[in-house]
Amino acid sequence: MLCTCRKFLCILVFCFLQRSSFAQTHLPTNIDLTQQQDYVLKRVSSADPSGANADFRQIDPGSVLTLMDANGPGMLTHIWITVASPEAYHLKKLVLRIYWDHETTPSVEAPLGDFFGLGLGEFHLWESELLSVGSDKALNSFFFMPFQKHARITVSNEGRQKVDAFYFNLDYRAYSQALPRGTLYFHAQFRQAQPNHGWTSDWQNNGDPQVDRKTNLDGKENYVWLDAAGRGHFVGVTMSVLQNQDGWWGEGDDMFFIDGEARSSIAGTGSEDYFLGAWNFGGHPFFYQLYGAPVVGEERAGGKSSVYRFHLDSPITFQKSIHATMEHGHANHRSDNFYSVAYWYQSEPHAPFPVLPSVDQRILRPQPVGGPGNSAAVHP
């Protein structure tokens, strides 16, 4: 018994030393509330500088609002935004961009709503460890976003009407010493396929023999969440779907190709499985800290869904590159619309982002792709 206790004590001491060593060389993203912190908390906000109650900004069409323009070293820890706009789909028409250390191309570029998991262009409540939408229409991000020299955050109004009121509070830690060497930078990238192009429209059910017999090992026609070059790790994805065809949209598998591999070393068994549900989500919405489906639509043309998954248990690491994808239907037989934002950390510089689709292209619209139920698709 004494020997067992000593062994257990040795294990505890070893773990403590390992943790202490880790903490000395990594950013303090976890707070020990019993210890004095080594940062100064700062905030930039839309608060009325006069002390009156006009605590918002307006954004004219075609204008850019700078939310943050701060020197480092620092780490953004929380973003809160709420918007009042009369324009339909303003969540698709406002674009969030974040630039680190005076870079000329953004490390974050996405429609405002999509960044916060509202890829359908409509508000709905949901909650996770990293992103949430509170009542009413309150957008929150808790991603840690370090910067060594400088951080600049902007929102562009690419719509046709003025944003009547744009409120924001951004909290960040200001450090007196440089960030640790090798610190990875936060990135987020929007992509869409409106529509995905399935290899056939001649099918009636997802399980038709000609569909099930089709094989896909190289993932060349998969929907792409992310193509990134450099060293880093993939943290997760939010995705929304507008169905152009009847039936369950989520027969496609997730496939991750790491460091240029020809065949994915990480491959899944179905879309709802990747998002940690099962059996078409049972037709019921749900959201938890790391995964969920806040919107589960009818399995028909015109149906809408929103899903998310965060890999905080084990981010997907890469040393040279990552190609993160998902099939659209089994072996890519379906032609639904996908809208997504991938979130990851990596060394700079990052690879060029795809050109952001135009405002008109970002608005959800059903597409004439053929297949079951396609003629019944209606504008959302």
Residue map of PLM features:
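Beta-strand-centric surfaces of beta-sandwich/beta-rich domains
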Residues: 24-380
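N-terminal secretory signal peptides that target proteins for export/translocation
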Residues: 1-5
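Bacterial N-terminal signal peptides
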Residues: 7-20
